[in-house]
Design a protein with these regions (language model features):
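Active-site hotspot residues in diverse enzymes, especially metal/ion-binding acidic/histidine motifs
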Residues: 1-362
Length: 362
């Protein structure tokens, strides 16, 4: 077939025009081939769009018919450009379902992307921003890097939005100028970071970002993305590391646990490791995740100290005891409450009002 039609796009192969010329000349393909001094098979393949119009063949046809050779060569170029246009349109159609799964308003609201009038515009904007040729690639769990999620059953929608959020975090992280990664400096900074749990976001965020910058960590804090499920990610780039978290659960204790969890992953130095969920993890990844969890728990509330609190609460947990312990540990009471709730010592409904919440506004 020497012409391809898709929607309102038509791609005419040069063979289409050669076939029309032969009809006008009342000439067979065999006779045309003889006059060009090429095989009849070559003309047959050309007319049937099985081969492109070569420069040599265009030159022969130009001499025989008195047609400008550039005109003939442009027929092939135009055909190829139309094919690209058709393939691009097909890809856009295939991506319509993907873009429906993504909250595009997230990017508009956070002034990351411009308002898009159509699904096609959304696709083009997202592809350029996410550095992918096709949004269907977002279905791949291993497209970027492994990520940590609290979603129990991971769906395709979760994978798509996790990849979207991850690339967004990476984009912001790569824009940050930080010093070369210094593991010792980061280890020394951990106690200072822990003290920030007693501060308000407007006070600790600039300090936290600057401290990370000195250690070679590009710290990214983003609002959570609908259907994402990702809590945080660590990704290495040469001599710096991107560490990103979001406000998916909004509670301050979850925020700080995520910070130290991701710092734990930084110290593991597994430069391509990402965790999706327990059901699909290898044992190695489970070990890495458990190790990062342990690290975060012990930094925030060392186990031995935590056990003294539990012993003192044998007759019941009171808010006064929580505040006493938090003051002793130099940490926000909400972090103690969150740990007690997580461990099942107290129900999630108890003292929840005492757990501070953060909201990320870009």
């Amino acid at each position: 077939m020497n012409n391809i039609i898709y929607k309102n796009i038509i791609a005419f192969h040069p063979g289409f025009y050669i076939e029309e010329i032969l009809d006008d000349l009342a000439m067979t393909q065999e006779e045309f081939a003889k006059r060009l001094d090429v095989s009849a098979k070559t003309i047959s393949k050309l007319v049937n769009a099985q081969i492109p119009l070569s420069n040599d063949l265009a030159s022969r046809i130009s001499s025989m018919l008195g047609i400008n050779v550039e005109t003939l060569i442009n027929l092939q170029k135009t055909y190829e450009l139309k094919l690209i246009e058709i393939e691009k349109e097909k890809k856009i159609d295939a991506q319509i379902e993907i873009v429906k799964e993504i909250d595009y308003n997230y990017f508009v609201k956070n002034q990351i992307l411009n308002v898009a009038k159509s699904a096609s515009d959304k696709i083009q904007n997202l592809c350029a921003f996410l550095k992918v040729s096709d949004l269907t690639l977002l279905r791949k769990p291993d497209l970027l890097a492994s990520f940590r999620t609290s979603v129990q059953t991971v769906t395709e929608r979760n994978i798509i939005n996790a990849n979207v959020w991850l690339q967004t975090a990476i984009n912001f992280g790569l824009q940050k100028q930080v010093k070369p990664f210094d593991e010792n400096k980061l280890k020394l900074a951990v106690p200072e970071i822990r003290k920030m749990t007693l501060m308000q976001p407007q006070e600790f965020l600039p300090k936290l970002e600057q401290l990370f910058e000195e250690c070679g960590v590009a710290f990214v804090l983003l609002p959570s993305l609908k259907n994402c499920g990702v809590n945080g990610v660590v990704k290495w780039y040469d001599d710096k590391v991107v560490l990103a978290i979001n406000d998916r659960n909004s509670f301050a204790d979850t925020f700080w646990f995520s910070i130290f969890h991701e710092i734990g992953h930084v110290f593991q130095k597994k430069k391509t490791k990402i965790i999706i969920n327990d059901k699909v993890l290898s044992q190695t990844s489970q070990d890495l995740e458990s190790d990062a969890d342990r690290y975060a728990r012990d930094i925030l509330l060392p186990q031995k100290e935590y056990e003294t609190l539990l012993d003192s609460c044998s007759n019941g947990v009171t808010y006064d005891k929580i505040c006493w312990f938090a003051n002793r540990m130099g940490i926000h009471p909400g972090i103690v409450i969150g740990r007690l709730q997580h461990d099942g010592v107290i129900p999630f409904s108890r003292f929840t009002k005492m757990r501070e919440k953060y909201q990320i506004i870009m």
